[in-house]
Amino acid sequence: EQFLSIIREIMSTFPSLLIVLEHITTCAAVEYIKQAPANVAATITVHHLSLTLDDVIGAELRPHHFCKPVAKCYGDREALRNVVRSGHPRFFLGTDSAPHLRGKKECSHGCAGIFTAPSTPALICEFFQGDVEKINRFANEFGAAFYHLSPTKAHITLERWDGSPNNTPRVRMDGPVEIFTGNDDGILPWRIIHDE
C-alpha cells in the first residue's frame, strides 16, 4: 500500500497521464482507484479473483499458487470480486500467465507466476456465471475504452463441460507445466469450442 503515495506524486506531476495499477491485490488499491480521477485505472488477474494467501501458504505450501504480487487475505479478495462484479469501468482484466516448468515451481527456490493462459477464458466465464455482457465489458470493453481504443470484434464461444485441462495436451518444454484451474480437482467448467 506504500506505493499509493508514489502514485499520488506521479499524478500530481503528470495530471493528464493515463495511469494503470497492474494486477492489484488489496482492498486499499480498490478504494484508491474508485476515488481517483478518470485517468487512473487498475487491472485484476483471474487468479487474484480466486486465491487468498491461505491458498498459497495455508496448511501446506502450494507452489503453483505462488505469484507476485502475492495473493492477500479474504477481505482483499472480496474487495476485488465486488468491484469487478459491480461493473466499475476502471477495473479491467489484466492477463498474466507464467508457464514455469513444474521443476522450477516445486523446489526450494521456486519461481513466482501462475500459468493461466489456457484457463483464463473459462475462469472469467465461471466468475460471471456465463453473463456474456459482463464478461465482454471486463475482458474487452473497459480496458479499450480507458486507452481510447476500439474493443476487439473477435470473439470466442465457450460451452459448459466437466473435462479436465490436465487430460488435454499440455505445454511441454523440458517437463509439464501445471495449468491453473482455480480448484483442487483440476477441472474447468467451461471450454472454448470456437475461436474467431
Enumerate the predicted regions with their spans.
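Amphipathic, soluble alpha/beta structural segments
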Residues: 1, 95-107, 167-175
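Histidine/acidic residue-rich metal-binding segments in metalloenzymes
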Residues: 1-93
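Short, glycine-/Ser/Thr-/acidic-enriched flexible segments
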Residues: 26, 47, 98-100, 163
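Solvent-exposed, non-transmembrane amphipathic alpha-helical segments
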Residues: 39, 60-62, 100, 155, ...
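Short secondary-structure transition/capping segments
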Residues: 54-55, 105-106, 164
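His/Asp/Glu-enriched, well-ordered alpha-helical/loop segment
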Residues: 86-151
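Active-site microenvironment of metallo-dependent hydrolases
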Residues: 125, 129-196
